[in-house]
Regions:
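Internal alpha/beta loop-helix hairpins
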Residues: 1-68
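Generic beta-strand structural signal
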Residues: 14, 54-56, 87, 117, ...
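Exposed loop/turn and edge beta-strand positions of beta-sandwich/beta-sheet ligand-binding modules
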Residues: 45, 106, 122
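Short aromatic-glycine-enriched beta-strand elements
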Residues: 57-62, 118-127
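Glycine/charge-rich catalytic "coupling/switch" loops of P-loop NTPases
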Residues: 69-116, 134, 138-178
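Short beta-strand-turn/beta-hairpin segments enriched in glycine/proline and small hydrophobics
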Residues: 125-135
Length: 178
């Protein structure tokens, strides 16, 4: 999946010898019904953004994604550069109130679009709208119940900085880790 994101804008999913789905990479990665094809553990979304600043003290970059801003490990790109960021569903947590006193720096206001529970596992995939774009979160079914999550509900998406992969930014070195 990482190679598809880095190299292409369009993707085709084949099933039983035929085209099952085709479209933009971002669009197909957001589809919860394609989890088996896109990989549950590596499932995620691609966000389009723009570098809006750098913090040399902490070696971070700020990326605007619509009206919201994400902090990520320093990207070797100039302010104003457009970027695509891969955010894995397993690196997104959800909260119904804005958390404080935590190490996760990226807390985005969001609205639940879709919840798909995996009946034979402990997990659920939740698709949330963060404004102009969407994120996937892979959380437990128990968390969905405990939080009272429902389509249309307001949540906060907590994105770990480790979720940003330098390879998607065009650098073939190892993935960015914090």
């Amino acid at each position: 999946v990482d190679e598809v994101i880095r190299l292409g804008d369009r993707m085709v999913v084949l099933r039983e010898g035929g085209v099952f789905a085709a479209g933009g990479v971002t669009e197909l990665l957001e589809r919860l019904d394609l989890a088996e094809a896109t990989g549950r553990f590596e499932a995620g979304t691609v966000l389009s953004g723009e570098i809006v600043g750098h913090d040399e003290t902490f070696k971070t970059s700020r990326v605007s994604v619509g009206e919201q801003v994400l902090d990520m490990p320093r990207a070797p790109m100039a302010v104003g550069t457009g970027v695509r960021l891969r955010v894995r569903a397993r690196d997104v947590a959800l909260a119904t109130t804005r958390p404080s006193g935590i190490s996760i720096r990226n807390i985005l206001g969001a609205r639940v679009i879709q919840i798909v529970e995996e009946p034979d596992t402990a997990f659920a995939e939740v698709l949330v709208d963060i404004g102009a774009q969407r994120l996937r979160a892979r959380i437990t079914r128990a968390a969905v119940a405990d939080l009272g999550l429902a389509e249309g509900g307001a949540v906060f998406a907590l994105v770990k900085s480790v979720a940003f992969d330098r390879r998607v930014l065009g650098d073939d070195s190892a993935a960015t880790r914090t």
